[in-house]
Structure formats: C-alpha cells, structure tokens
Amino acid sequence: MKIAVVGLGAMGSVYATLFLEAGHEVWAIDEWEEHIDAIKSRGLTLEGASGSRTNYNLNVTTKMSDIGNSDLYIIATKASGVAKAAKWIGSVSSSNSLIITIQNGLGAGERISKHMSSNQLILGVAEGFGASIIGPGHAHHNSMKLIRIGELTGGITDRLLFLEKIWHEAGFKVKAFEDITQLIWEKFICNVTFSAPCTVFNKTIGELMEDPCLWEIALGGTKEAFRIAKVKQINLSFEDPVAYV
C-alpha cells in the first residue's frame, strides 16, 4: 500500500516509521528543509515507546508533486496546517484515495472537505499518544495508548475496518468508533475546561481545580461548550458536563 504522511513532525515521524517497518511504500512531506535534508543524509531516527532505530529507506520530500497519488494520506500537521495539507493532497490524489487526519480539535473535517470530497475522509482522535522532535532527523515517541478512528458521517464501514486492520498490523493500538463526532466533542469540552484556563492563568490542572474563582471560570467554558454541542445535536454520552470533566 502506498501511504503518504503529510507533515513529518513528531507524530508524523511515528506514523511514517511504523508503516515503513510494516512493509508499506511510505512517502513523507514537510516544509522543514533542514529536517528533510537530515533524513536524506543520515536517516530518520525514532526512539521511545515503540523502540529505538534509524530508518534509511523513507522517501522524503518538500514537494507534493514528488509523491503523486497514494492509497492513503495521513495528515499529521498541527491544526493550523490542516487546510494547506488538504490543498496539497487535493492537487495529486484520486477519487479512490483515503485521507485520515488525527486531530483532537474541532473543524478539521470541514477544512479538509473544502479541497476534496468528504466521502474520502476518515477522522481520528488520539488518546495518550505523544511524541516530540529532538532535532532534525530525530524524534522521540513518548507514549502510545489508543487512536480511535471513524467515518465523518458515522457508522462502521468496511473501509473503516480495513484501516483499523492495517494500523493494527503496523503496531498501533487503534479502534474503529461508530460516532467519532461524539468523541471529538467530548474531548473538546475537556480541552475547553482545562487547556485554555491553565494557559491563561499559568496553572496546572490541579492548581486550577483548587482555586474556587478560577475553577468557576473554567466551568463556565465547560457549560458553554456543552450547550453549543446540544444545539448542534451532538450525541454526547453524558448530561452533566461538570460531573463529566
């Protein structure tokens, strides 16, 4: 299977390495020229949760035209780069190509669908899955708990189960999920509660929850996000957002 990883940062390096080692034809693209040049000259080194090794056979480039059409595109950019990645993919992919993006925030599916058919798109959410870049050509795999994947329109399909299978075979812990939108929103509500307030107030999660005033502000965001989800008719697994977080 020809797989293209779009965005060869920390997470992209994990995806590219494991799929390459599973026997797939893997290409990876990134705009960070120093990183790409380092991989071309001395390979991609990945260490950590999935083991330590250096791979010299990864096809890397800064030009999407070098990759061309692929069976599967994995968008591994940060959220701000999703639309650009989708535009790149749209310029070379076919109607039979599948695109998967693993983003924990909202809106990735909508941004990608502007550049290709939403029927080609699979969404993913990572839980306890982390990685970091040590330097050009060198990444660290911090942890790998679970990736949930699902159809944009919901349901369990044959292609979703096929993707679950090839990700499993590459060493990932992956589960096909019937309602990925529910999962994305539930994670979003948690992020609204903790991520922004902790950043703004420069507090850890524990410190935030121990401060009555700041915690009340954080829960205001929780409740607002919950109300928006209800208006959008998202099928959440809870009715009390405060108890949930």
Regions found by a protein language model. Give the residues of each.
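Internal alpha-helical scaffold of NAD(P)-dependent oxidoreductase catalytic cores
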Residues: 92, 115-120, 135-238
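NAD(P)+-binding Rossmann beta1-loop-alpha1 motif at the extreme N-terminus of oxidoreductases
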Residues: 1-52
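Short catalytic/ligand-gating loop segments at beta-alpha or beta-beta junctions
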Residues: 238-244
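Short, charged/polar "capping" segments at the starts of alpha-helices
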Residues: 35-38, 109-110, 157
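Short, solvent-exposed loop/turn elements at beta->coil junctions and helix N-caps
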Residues: 128, 179-182, 245
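A structural signal for isolated positions on well-ordered beta-strands in alpha/beta enzyme cores
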Residues: 4, 27, 98-100, 122, ...
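Rossmann-like NAD(P)(H) cofactor-binding subdomain of soluble oxidoreductases
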Residues: 29, 53-138
